[in-house]
A protein has these predicted regions:
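Conserved binding/recognition cores within well-folded domains
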Residues: 1-102
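C-terminal output/interaction extensions
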Residues: 104-117
Length: 117
């Protein structure tokens, strides 16, 4: 059975299959669940989601998990997190083309994952 993430959406409950999730990103008190079609906010911690969803996702930063299958490439980028003048590693998520910051500590693991695809 594929794990699901249960989200509240305008008064209804939606079950999002983990296989449709491109990334999970923690922002303040919520986690953004991003699919190719849309985004939702959930009130579950990133650590809880990481434990529940298993190896399908890789932690790229303290605030983000990316689906291994959604990682297109890793490169040095100016301002991946919007901090003026800083350069850092970032991973491009397919099919949306969005870039997410990758911590220095996680860059090698992300590089290996992309190379193994």
């Amino acid at each position: 059975d594929e794990p699901v993430i249960v989200v509240q959406d305008r008064g209804r409950v939606v079950r999002v299959p983990a296989g449709e999730v491109l990334y999970l990103k923690a922002e303040l008190k919520y986690v953004t669940v991003r699919t190719a079609a849309t985004s939702w906010l959930v009130d579950e911690s990133l650590s809880e989601l990481e434990a529940r969803l298993g190896s399908r996702f890789i932690r790229v930063h303290r605030n983000a998990l990316v689906a291994r299958s959604a990682m297109a490439r890793l490169e040095r980028r100016d301002d991946p997190d919007g901090h003026d003048g800083q350069e850092g590693w970032a991973v491009q998520v397919r099919p949306t083309g969005e870039w997410l910051a990758v911590s220095r500590r996680q860059a090698a693991a992300v590089r290996e994952t992309i190379a193994a695809q």
